[in-house]
Amino acid sequence: MDIFSIVKKKLKRKVVVSIAIKEYSMSRDSTRQLSPSFRVREFGCKGSDVVLLDEELVVLLQCIREHFGKPVHITSGYRTAAHNAAVGGSKSSQHLLGRAADFYVEGVDVATVAAYAETLLPSRGGIGRYPKDAKHPKRSTGWVHIDTRANKSRWTL
């Protein structure tokens, strides 16, 4: 049984999963398949060959993809400190560690995606909701942030 299958089973049983963060190279590994739906290049950062990535994050996103049966588009994965600062990210962002992704599911609203993510991470991890709404009319789409931090954090912006 591969690591993806093992972690997915543990997540379904609500078992705390601990996986090491791996380092990839965009020049060498960009097309490497991480799960049935995701490749290294989807988590890359502009201007960086290095991609740090927590395998559990990939499993969470694959579970979301399978649950909705629709494409999951990652808009931000790993970030270098320079890129994180340029996009206004928190100095303690989980993106800097390869433990976070911002994404949207084609044709599914932010609240529905976040509610399902909550079933995967009921007592830990970060889940942020960034809806496209009257308060945020300039957003081209809404998105969800998910991360694998040890403590539980939830927010809506």
Show where each model-derived region lies.
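Short amphipathic alpha-helical surface micro-motifs
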Residues: 55-57, 82-87, 119-126
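Extended, low-complexity, intrinsically disordered C-terminal regulatory tails
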Residues: 58-88
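Catalytic cores and adjacent binding grooves of peptidoglycan-active enzymes
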Residues: 8, 12, 51, 92, ...
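Extracytoplasmic cell-surface/polysaccharide-interacting catalytic and binding patches
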Residues: 1-67, 139, 149-157
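Solvent-exposed, flexible loop/coil residues
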Residues: 25, 38, 82, 87, ...
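Amphipathic alpha-helical interface surfaces
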Residues: 53-60, 70, 83, 99, ...
